[in-house]
Design a protein with these regions (language model features):
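Alpha-helical and His/Cys-centered functional microenvironments
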Residues: 12, 34, 108
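Surface-exposed, polar helix/loop patches in the mature regions of secreted/periplasmic/lumenal proteins
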Residues: 83-127
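Short S/T/G/P-rich N-terminal loop/turn motif that feeds into the first structured element of a domain
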Residues: 3, 17-81, 89-96, 123-127
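Generic detector of short, well-ordered, non-transmembrane alpha-helical segments enriched
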Residues: 14-15, 100
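Sec-dependent N-terminal signal peptides
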Residues: 4-12
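Short, structurally constrained coil/turn elements
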Residues: 12, 58-61, 114
Length: 127
């Protein structure tokens, strides 16, 4: 019985140690929000969304990608309808690889003519 308790304590301690290592990984979020021009068609906006999603498979330094439509009831969105969150392991990945990557440059050229307003916020994840 004494050995079983010792084994459980050791297993629990190892599990907590592994959990702490996971949460200590530094991550950076790149949040991009768009207000599209009224003249942009639904088809154009849908193509832009698909192109942004495709960056995840084209740029290996993107660790995670999420997006969604504004559903806030607060009416403080200033016309912003789309929000995208891109996760990087480092600022070097974001600034040195992603920003100048040909797929990202192509995406910016695609979206540019359709956007009335862009808001970008980057932050280091604090747990």
């Amino acid at each position: 019985m004494k050995y079983a308790i010792l084994a459980l304590a050791l297993l629990f301690s190892t599990s907590l140690s592994a959990q702490n290592k996971k949460t200590s990984t530094t991550m950076y979020r790149h949040v991009v929000m768009f207000k599209f021009k009224a003249s942009s068609s639904k088809e154009s906006v849908d193509n832009i969304v698909k192109a942004f999603i495709a960056l995840k498979s084209e740029i290996p330094v993107i660790k995670a990608f999420e997006w969604g439509l504004n559903v806030s009831p607060e009416h403080q969105d200033q016309g912003i309808t789309h929000c995208f969150v891109v996760t990087f392991a480092s600022t070097q990945d974001r600034d040195g690889v992603y920003q100048d990557h040909p797929a990202h440059v192509k995406f910016k050229n695609l979206v540019g003519p359709h956007v009335e307003k862009v808001v970008v916020v980057d932050f280091k994840v604090e747990n």
